[in-house]
Amino acid sequence: YVKQMNLLIHEWDLPSVNLLGAIDDGKGVWATGYQNGTDIYHPNTDGHREFTYAMVPSLFDAIDAGKGQPSRVSGTSYVLADKKVLVFTPEDMVHPFTLSFKIKGTTDGVIASFANGSNATGTLKIQDGVVVYHSPLTGEIKGAVSVTDNQWHVVSLTHYYAQGRTLLYTDKALAGELGEKLTVGKFTIGDNTSANSREYSELFFYRSAMNQEEIDKLCDGRMLKSSLEIYAPLDGSKSTIENLAQSMNSVVLK
């Protein structure tokens, strides 16, 4: 019921925060070290702090500016080629997060990367036709779904900071997970070292992790809005990259 309630709140037509993805352990209880002593109903100070990281920092500025609730946009895309990339930096400190986007192409190569700490980079690559996550710390997660068939595929990387877990999904299929705690900075979509062409659509960045049920709904085309900082439909016919999420953050083409 907790997961069902979380999904319901996602689709309410008002701003919301995905608290479940902040400090849940995946089974409806607090992650280890975040419970308030023997009080099973409340988190401790660190737990409340994790809640704040799941809030979009500029949400109220966006509301004050008249920015409304986003809706899903289908049928648009953006081709990245000749070393062009899309770049955004999350507002303020990030702990839990989910990065999700659609890709279509026929070649291997880097599809996204992010800064972690001061001098490490995490990458999402297509290797031998499948998506592979290379951790900025150690290890990798390798998918099993072929994504070089020139069809649309959804790639989702989700990180539970409190649990210390990163999970990779290709479409609705869980590729695997790593035990790690990330402190992410700038995100880059595409590969600024390659001239190869790849098509992208619907870029999402959430300030909260997502479970299997949420990933399924996202792949089904539902508009999940809780803790959403970036939603860029990506439309190559427009001169700028629009962010429809209720935040003041932006995505830049470089």
Sequence positions of predicted segments:
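Short edge-strand/loop segments of extracellular domains
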Residues: 114-121, 170-174, 222-223
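Extracellular, beta-strand-rich glycan-interacting domains
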Residues: 98-105, 194-222, 229-238, 247
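Extracellular/periplasmic catalytic domains that process cell-envelope and extracellular macromolecules
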Residues: 10-11, 92-94, 125, 181-182, ...
